[in-house]
Amino acid sequence: MVSRRARATLLALVLSTPVPHRAAGDPPGQSVLALDVRAFRPVEGPTSGPAVYYHVVDAPEGPLLRGAYRPGLETVTMGFEIPENLRQKIRRLRWSWRARAFPEGGNECRGGRGDSAASVSVAWKRGLKWYVLKYVWSSVAPLGEVCDRKRTLLLARDTIILESGGATGRWLPEVVDVRRAFIDHFAGGDAGAEIPDLVGVGLMTDGDQTNSESGADWARFEVVY
């Protein structure tokens, strides 16, 4: 007879182990890996307790990760570490999200207003240097704008306004060609450029700069390789 503790341990392993598959509509020879939202962990800011303002909701359509920022909280970023054997293989990232509360006047293209209802970041690393593309669902920033560019010895980062405004509570699907995006933003459009390891995916909702509430749900993260 299997003990209750053994059953719980087995369930945790099953839930945290990503399972590759090929989805209908994906080109032959490519596989899809679902990233379980239960496996996202705090990577910036507080790491435990009520200060971590994210939790998993077991919704009828599947699990989702919900973030609800309140003024006065320290900003927390959640992250998923990509398995080492896939870091050079990933072609696309897919997910769905819905805004639940827009930070008042949040505008990532203006200093001091850079709060987002939701963001998804893709991180590559070569040696000590990080390359980050942050895709945001903004309150009011112009759709398609690229803002908050940073270029230092250890960090290259761009923020892309992927969605702006709109109704709350409405799911939107997203697809990003991550290899093409790296080439366009960090390699001057050189299709032959060497792409560093894609090491992680992050997400965040925040309202610390505008001192306002913000919130979002994320679900159905997948990488295509």
Task: Locate predicted features.
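Extracellular carbohydrate-recognition regions
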Residues: 24-48
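Extracellular beta-strand elements of beta-rich domains used
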Residues: 201, 219-223
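Solvent-exposed strand-to-loop "edge" motifs in beta-rich extracellular domains
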Residues: 96-102, 125, 179
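Bacterial N-terminal signal peptides
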Residues: 8-18
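Extracellular/luminal beta-rich ligand-recognition
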Residues: 113-156
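Extracellular beta-strand ligand-recognition surfaces/modules
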Residues: 112-120, 152-154, 161-164, 168-215
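Extracellular/lumenal carbohydrate-interaction signature centered on repeated Trp-anchored short motifs
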Residues: 80-93, 165-168, 194
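Short carbohydrate-recognition loop motifs
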Residues: 55-75
